[in-house]
Amino acid sequence: MNSPRDLRRRIKSITSTAQLTKAMEMVAASKMRKAQEAAIVARPFGRLVYAIQREATTHMGDFKHPLLEVREVRKRAVILVGADKGLCGPLNSNVLRMATKFDPKTTTFITAGRRAAQFIARTQRQLAAEFSYGDSPTYAEARAIAGLARDLFLKNEVDQVQIVATRFVNTLTQIPVTLEFLPIGEIHGLELPTTKPSTSEPSADDTEFAFEPSPEFVMSYLLLHYLNIYIYEVLVNAKASEQSARMVSMKNATDNADKLIKDLNLEYNKLRQGNITKEMLEIAGGKAG
């Protein structure tokens, strides 16, 4: 049976832990909001790219481009996007588990995030390069990753490039996904589904475009930027997912600590009350004697 001193020591220790997890929860919540805001700021540019692509396609005939070339897949590259840190529940393990489905003999990995790089090194899989990205992913970080993947594809070192990452749905839901990257199929976006377009934003669909010198020239230029924008949206989704999962994980830890503290306080008070009652009975018995 625990002594009052042991219980006080445990209560003090768990209280300190609860204060730490609460602080980490608040930090993660702040970073999550920033990641979502970054996605909102980038969204109009993404929408414009997709609208221009759709319009340019209607003005072109049989348009061919190396980034659109579909080849028999003998070797592939996978851009594996993970978190930099842990304490975010099953988020990392869910993404890394999907990476194990690829044949290690024919797959080379490009990693983004420390946990992804550590996993590839630990499992001794082929690694083309590893990248890092901050709490607020930048376009330059996305461009570096997209550039390497594009070069591998254009040099015929790989026949296909896919992405394994986490799609942010909401604070409680993050879904590990496998996305097609190269060759480029239908151009589309990875918008955060929890955010809505601002009514003040101009609609790209209502805009008339004039292509100079030609739709084909514009499309060739557009495809390169599309790859960068797509990776940027993937990174923003991954970071929002990481911070959301960490916030929920820390909130659960804080709630569990609070419940444990409550139970220990109850046990401590019962033990203390029992000791007081015992002492009073001993005193009363002594006087009676």
Please provide the spans of the model-predicted regions.
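C-terminal beta-strand-loop-alpha-helix "lid" module of Rossmann-like NAD(P)-dependent dehydrogenases
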Residues: 1-289
